[in-house]
């Protein structure tokens, strides 16, 4: 399955490929290649939702301290982000900022902040744009009720997602580990079962 906003880019690439073929087959092949990359990038695989607090993004954990976990998403990771836990969306706020390369941890970055209120406290998900990831798309609005693993947004063409959690949780993944949105359990609290 492909995320809905990818279809327009794929269609435009294939149309340009047909027109470019009149100029030169090699130019046409470049557009076909871009269409194939776009189809791969905008893929929307089914996920089996994990039992604890789940990762909000696909990628590699590159920072973990206290109650904060950061995930670097390369252009080859699926870029659809998911709710780490079920609850009510308190707010969705876009914060303007710079767009450095996603592998560089930096403050003042273009960010979409999603706060999810749960029975165990507030989860904060930050979708951060990078130099190539210029567009952050949010699928949720203030007041929405989300389920754990539900799609909450997408960052186009690679970047970073941050998860900040309430007190009382312990991370079960470490720096360098690969995670999958909605599927990989990122942290647990043994005192209650998954929402």
UniProtKB/Swiss-Prot annotation:
Major location (coarse): membrane
InterPro entries membership: PS_Dcarbxylase (IPR003817), PSD-A (IPR033175)
Site (Cleavage (non-hydrolytic)): 158-159
UniProt keyword annotations, A-Z: Cell membrane, Decarboxylase, Lipid biosynthesis, Lipid metabolism, Lyase, Membrane, Phospholipid biosynthesis, Phospholipid metabolism, Pyruvate, Zymogen
Active site: 159
Membrane topology according to the record: Peripheral membrane protein
Key word Transmembrane present: no
Subcellular localization, as worded in the UniProt entry: Cell membrane
EC identifiers of the protein: 4.1.1.-
The protein, known as: Putative archaetidylserine decarboxylase proenzyme
Native source species: Archaeoglobus fulgidus (strain ATCC 49558 / DSM 4304 / JCM 9628 / NBRC 100126 / VC-16)
Taxonomic lineage from the root: Archaea, Methanobacteriati, Methanobacteriota, Archaeoglobi, Archaeoglobales
Encoding gene per record: asd
């Amino acid at each position: 399955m492909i995320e809905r906003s990818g279809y327009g880019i794929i269609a435009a690439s294939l149309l340009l490929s047909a027109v470019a073929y009149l100029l030169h087959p090699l130019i046409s092949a470049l557009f076909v290649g871009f269409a194939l990359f776009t189809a791969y990038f905008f893929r929307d695989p089914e996920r089996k939702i994990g039992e604890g607090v789940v990762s909000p993004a696909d990628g590699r954990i590159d920072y973990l301290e206290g109650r904060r976990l950061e995930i670097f998403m390369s252009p080859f990771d699926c870029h659809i982000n998911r709710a780490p836990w079920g609850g009510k969306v308190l707010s969705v706020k876009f914060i303007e900022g710079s767009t450095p390369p996603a592998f560089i941890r930096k403050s003042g970055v273009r960010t979409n902040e999603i706060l999810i209120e749960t029975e165990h406290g507030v989860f904060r998900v930050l979708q951060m744009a990078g130099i190539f990831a210029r567009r952050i798309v949010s699928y949720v609005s203030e007041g929405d009720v989300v389920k754990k693993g539900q799609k909450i947004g997408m960052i186009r063409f690679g970047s970073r997602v941050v998860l900040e959690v309430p007190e009382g949780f312990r991370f079960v993944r470490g720096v360098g580990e690969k995670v999958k949105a909605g599927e990989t359990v990122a942290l647990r609290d043994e005192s209650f079962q998954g929402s």
